[in-house]
Design a protein with these regions (language model features):
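A cross-family acyltransferase "interaction/gating" segment
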Residues: 120-121, 159, 170-236
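Short, conserved charged micro-motifs
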Residues: 44-47, 233-238
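Membrane-anchoring hydrophobic helices of lipid-metabolizing enzymes
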Residues: 2-84
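Active-site metal-binding loops of divalent metal-dependent hydrolases
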Residues: 166
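Catalytic core of membrane glycerolipid acyltransferases/transacylases, capturing the structured
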Residues: 34-38, 42, 50, 80-139
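Anionic-ligand binding region
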Residues: 144-146, 150
Length: 255
């Protein structure tokens, strides 16, 4: 009874502490590091990606400190992914920042509105994050220029991760896919790695402000499978890649 009575207050306090991390850690620790990277790094884009990775690794370490009943399990094979287009199911706001925390060299798709936010937008642009137009409209004028750049980036060992559902699932089921990620993989002759994310929505549900701090949760990220360049992804329509990716995600959810 005591726990149920005070749980909303505890959820609010921990939520505010987690959001406070964004402000305090950025202002006092990471903004000076980003500024130094902008001025002195030989490869500014890669330096910003690395700083973003560290920023969110610290965030999840802080989350586990405040919420000791939350465990995070990452399959060893996930850390080894390089030079790939990564797709994953999408359950929570935590999903993209969790993937950022796993890969020092990464790019992803960010809503256009975030690029307009002062300072935050500068960080996103400097890290080389992409506009949704690249995956939503295959006829954008500079598509081939961006594809050429992406091909070189992937060849250097970087990863591009995308949530092909385009929005968080409210039911937990895998939603309809957009074809953009699969088109990029085809044009770049890049393999697709399919990741299964589980239980992030139990910690930070869609459409909620408060973190759910009162239940034991094991968040996991596992490699559901791969679609190689010569496995239907690089030949013909991206539809084959979409179908196989869905099969891998839906199949892994039954285990």
């Amino acid at each position: 009874m005591f726990t149920k009575t005070f749980r909303p207050a505890v959820d609010l306090i921990i939520t505010l502490l987690l959001w406070a991390y964004y402000f305090a850690a950025f202002v006092f620790f990471f903004f000076p590091a980003y500024s130094a990277a902008a001025l002195f790094a030989a490869d500014r884009e890669r330096a910003f990606q690395n700083l973003n990775c560290i920023f969110y690794r610290c965030f999840f370490a802080y989350l586990k400190l405040l919420m000791p009943r939350v465990k995070i399990s990452i399959s060893p094979g996930v850390y080894a992914i390089r030079s790939s287009v990564i797709i994953a199911n999408h359950l929570s706001f935590l999903d993209p920042i969790l993937l950022i925390s796993l890969f020092r060299q990464h790019k992803t798709i960010v809503k256009s509105v975030f690029f307009k936010v002062p300072i935050f937008g500068w960080v996103l642009k400097s890290a080389g994050y992409l506009s949704p137009s690249l995956v939503q409209d295959s006829d954008v004028p500079d598509l081939m220029v961006q594809v050429k750049s992406m091909r070189a980036y992937l060849a250097s060992g970087g990863n591009l991760f995308i949530f092909p559902e385009g929005t968080r699932s409210r039911s937990g089921a895998v939603g309809p896919f957009e074809k953009g990620a699969f088109t990029i993989a085809k044009l770049c002759s890049a393999p697709i790695r399919v990741l299964r994310i589980e239980n992030t929505h139990l910690v930070y549900p869609p459409d909620c402000f408060l973190f759910n701090t009162g239940v034991p949760v094991k968040i996991s990220v596992s490699l559901a499978g791969s679609i190689e360049c010569d496995d239907g992804n690089n030949q013909g329509s991206p539809l084959k890649g979409m179908q196989k990716a869905r099969s891998l995600l839906e199949g892994s959810s039954t285990h």
